[in-house]
From Swiss-Prot:
Top-tier EC class: hydrolase
Protein name in the entry: Protein phosphatase 2C 3
Compositional bias per record (Acidic residues), positions renumbered to this chain: 79-90
Subcellular location: Cell membrane; Cytoplasm; Nucleus
Induction context: Induced by abscisic acid (ABA).
UniProt similarity note: Belongs to the PP2C family.
Disruption phenotype: No visible phenotype under normal growth conditions, but mutant plants exhibit reduced sensitivity to abscisic acid (ABA) and glucose during seed germination and seedling stage. Freshly harvested seeds of mutant plants exhibit increased seed dormancy.
Main location: membrane
UniProt binding sites for Mn(2+) 1: 162-163
Gene: AIP1
GO BP terms, alphabetized: negative regulation of abscisic acid-activated signaling pathway; negative regulation of seed dormancy process; positive regulation of gibberellic acid mediated signaling pathway; positive regulation of seed germination; release of seed from dormancy
Region (Disordered) residue spans: 30-100, 363-401
Superkingdom as given in the UniProt entry: Eukaryota
Annotated residues for binding of Mn(2+) 2: 162, 339, 424
Length: 442
């Protein structure tokens, strides 16, 4: 058996221009075949060569020709050319007047399908009418990467945290919760999302308790200026987006809303103390719900689940409610926001505003009968990718870039909440779920 680059005998291996790189790769590939498959008279020729004592010399010459052909391949081709997928399996090799079919092809490159690339997203967070900013937002696209032989998948993490009493629990959740979810996701091969999220939230709650005992007590700058950090906590609404699923874990009164085919679909339920099942759970644990400016646990906390708030345990728990939703082609976007938005804006109104904003930016919101000139169209298409990078602002240590349209949509929602006299901090994350797929050669 020999690895050869088979060409016409009269053609020489010469350098090829850059523009013919794709044609060259498709026309001349690396094959593994026996000499008898190439030429029916190969066996006879081999015997004659052996008798003449030049068999080894002939093999060396073929190997030399192959190395020359391999070295003459274009080495400066662009990434776009390198991303071409070689999928032709029917190969015909010509040798003068004869043609050889049924050749066993061993491709030197694998076609890898990379699904669900980094989604477009935008974020806006404002203090509003509050004196202190106690919200926190975490954006970690591609925080988990899994690869099989023929595919790569990326999981994306988005979280919104609404602190109360002070901001340090929300800030701690922003720093650590995605790492805990990542550890659980990599260690759990069965992808049991409910158990994974429950373990992650429980670990986060325990870390907050230990961190408060060792670090915060001496330097606590709580809203009430008290050294007792047990009265500090945070809500958490977290979404992990995979190519097939949308996983939402919620603890508190922040909310996740999916827009599917123009309709608002809530993926979480607020944990209010007067919710029937939460009220029963609190009373069974020996607690009470007192109405003091709304329903509150022991007349203090206006939510029945949160991370932290040690002085209210076991009535207030950190166990999240987890929903797993199958993704469809009708999914448009996902909104994660604190109660500063949802207290004054309905799910339907928020989805309508974001949908109008995204459709306008993508050109779908153009009025009926309005045409677009070819020059204008090409100019907008040319600027579309540029706006995603240049017109957006960076977030995070790794320079993650937000999408301009999603950012503007989240800003509009915060402005709407303030216009409706929201009295709380307002934080909004908008994630575009419209699919983008890319094929490339690894």
């Amino acid at each position: 058996m020999a690895d050869i680059c088979y060409e016409d005998e009269t053609s020489a291996c010469e350098s090829r221009p850059l523009w013919s790189s794709r044609k060259w790769r498709i026309g001349v590939q690396r094959f593994r075949m026996s000499p008898s498959e190439m030429n029916p008279t190969a066996s006879t020729t081999e015997e004659e060569d052996k008798s003449e004592g030049i068999y080894n010399k002939r093999n060396k010459q073929e190997e030399y020709d192959f190395m020359n052909c391999a070295s003459s391949s274009p080495s400066q081709s662009s990434p776009e050319e390198e991303s071409v997928s070689l999928e032709d399996s029917d190969v015909s090799i010509s040798d003068g007047n004869s043609s050889v079919n049924d050749v066993a092809v061993i491709p030197s490159k694998k076609t890898v399908k990379e699904t669900d690339l980094r989604p477009r997203y935008g974020v806006a967070s404002v203090c509003g009418r509050r004196r202190d900013m106690e919200d926190a937002v975490a954006l970690h696209p591609s925080f988990v990467r899994k690869q099989t032989e023929f595919s790569r998948t990326r999981w994306h993490y988005f979280g919104v945290y609404d602190g109360h009493g002070c901001s340090h629990v929300a800030a701690r959740c922003k720093e650590r919760l995605h790492e805990l979810v990542q550890e659980e996701a990599l260690s759990d091969k069965k992808e049991e999302w409910k158990k994974m999220m429950e373990r992650s939230f429980t670990r986060m709650d325990k870390e907050v308790v230990r961190w408060g005992e060792t670090v915060m007590s001496a330097n606590c700058r709580c809203e009430l200026q008290t050294p007792d950090c047990d009265a500090v906590g945070s809500t958490a609404v977290v979404s992990v987006i995979t190519p097939e699923k949308i996983i939402v874990a919620n603890c508190g009164d922040s909310r996740a809303v999916l827009c599917r085919n123009g309709k608002a679909v809530p993926l979480s339920t607020d944990h209010k103390p007067d919710r029937p099942d939460e009220l029963d759970r609190i009373q069974e644990a020996g607690g009470r719900v007192i109405y003091w400016d709304g329903a509150r646990v022991l007349g203090v906390l206006a939510m029945s689940r949160a991370i932290g708030d040690n002085y209210l345990k076991p009535y207030v728990t950190s166990e999240p409610e987890v929903t797993v939703t199958d993704r469809t082609e009708e999914d448009e976007f996902l909104i994660l926001a604190t109660d500063g938005l949802w207290d004054v804006v309905t799910n339907e109104a928020a989805c309508t505003m974001v949908r109008m904003c995204l459709n306008r930016k993508s050109g779908r919101g153009r009025r009926r009968g309005e045409t677009q000139t070819p020059g204008r169209r090409s100019e907008e298409e040319g600027k579309e990718e540029e706006e995603k990078v240049v017109g957006s602002r960076k977030n995070g240590k790794r320079g993650e870039i937000t999408d301009k349209a999603c950012t503007e949509a989240s800003v509009l929602l915060t402005k709407l909440a303030l216009a409706k006299h929201s009295s709380d901090n307002v934080s909004v994350v908008v994630i575009d779920l419209r699919r983008r797929r890319k094929r490339h050669v690894a």
